[in-house]
């Protein structure tokens, strides 16, 4: 554990939900990885440290990286909603990965997505971006969230816990999600869908940037 550190509280986001971790510094030492083990968040440093237990440390997050990951995460929600509008209500997220350079979203769909449909989804997604909609996030008891928003809040799989963080883009998309997000859809800039690939029966993967 001499290159790993556990804090009593942290702003660093661990790799989770298909989103990569934050990087930055703890007491001037570079943080190269952050992951969750059970209920504990572990920060991996680039070298050994000698912090005694109980020492107070200053943390600094790489905000440029955080913003880019947030762009791709919010854009995942936007594209999911846009695809549902273009292709039909059977569309759900089956998985996603948010990286720095690009991101992917896996959608439930019974056939390959055509170039024309990709263009329509991209157009609809950028329409949502240009509408400059505030992205809301609140913690809501599970039962209340399910009764208010329905079971479609579970995109990409069930979320554990009695209290859910609900990310709501009003009139666009509502999901239970623990990831980092933009404050407004306009911050996503331009969404560009690079390609679509059928990865298995009933699952199509979209590659995109924002």
Residue positions per predicted region:
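A glycine- and charged-residue-rich anion-binding loop/surface
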Residues: 1-210
């Amino acid at each position: 554990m001499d290159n790993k550190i556990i804090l009593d509280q942290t702003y660093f986001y661990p790799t989770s939900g298909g989103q990569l971790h934050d990087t930055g510094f703890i007491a001037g030492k570079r943080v190269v990885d952050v992951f969750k083990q059970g209920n504990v968040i572990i920060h991996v440093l680039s070298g050994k440290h000698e912090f005694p237990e109980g020492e107070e440390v200053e943390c600094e997050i790489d905000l440029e990286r955080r913003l880019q990951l947030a762009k791709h995460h919010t854009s995942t929600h936007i594209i999911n909603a846009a695809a549902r509008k273009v292709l039909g209500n059977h569309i759900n997220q089956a998985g996603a990965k948010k990286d720095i350079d690009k991101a992917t979203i896996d959608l439930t769909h019974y056939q390959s997505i055509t170039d024309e449909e990709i263009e329509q989804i991209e157009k609809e997604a950028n329409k949502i971006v240009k509408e400059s909609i505030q992205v809301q996030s609140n913690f809501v008891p599970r039962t209340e969230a399910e009764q208010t928003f329905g079971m479609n809040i579970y995109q990409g799989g069930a979320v554990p816990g009695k209290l859910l963080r609900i990310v709501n883009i009003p009139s666009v998309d509502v999901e239970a999600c623990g990831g980092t997000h933009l404050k407004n859809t306009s911050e996503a800039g331009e969404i560009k869908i690079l390609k679509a690939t059928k990865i298995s029966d009933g699952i199509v993967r979209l590659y995109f940037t924002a």
